[in-house]
Amino acid sequence: MFVMRKLIFLLSALLLCAGCDKNEGEPLDMAEQTRINNQFLGLWQEVDHPRHQCKYRGFHSNFKYTSFLLMLHSGDKLPSTYDGKPYHFEKGPECSKGTVYTLVLDNRLKEFICKYNGLLYMWWQENSDPDKYVGNPDYAYERN
């Protein structure tokens, strides 16, 4: 009887730990933050944009976000609300095409982010299917 209880306890603990790394929103340590950030460093330009404007997003080693809209005819640069704000990463939802992270901007706004086939994909829809966005040019950015 004692052996059976011990075995059940061990199996329960193993099953619990097996799902540990799939928790969305789980905080990541600084080494993991840096490893993830290194994938996204630099300025990224919207792939499929209107003729008159283009969105840019940037990631820096000091974890400060760059985001602006460039008006192509005039050259005017319009910064977003989150331009220059701090950011960090959390675990995101499962995706068959790549690893999705939750990008938390200024400890308020959460967006999903994934690098796939050399492009960056970003979207904000909560409870969405990442496979719908990753690979879709409407959500793609290329390194500038």
Please name every model-derived segment.
Residues 1-7:
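Positively charged n-region of N-terminal signal peptides that target proteins for export
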Residues 8-12:
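Sec-dependent signal peptide hydrophobic core
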Residues 16-19:
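C-terminal motif of bacterial Sec signal peptides marking the signal peptidase cleavage site
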Residues 22:
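Short, conserved catalytic or interaction motifs in soluble domains
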Residues 25-29, 80-91, 123-144:
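Edge beta-strand at a domain terminus
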Residues 26-45:
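N-terminal helix-cap/turn-to-beta initiation motif at the start of protein domains
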Residues 50-55, 66-119, 123-126:
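Contiguous, well-ordered beta-strand patches that form the walls/edges
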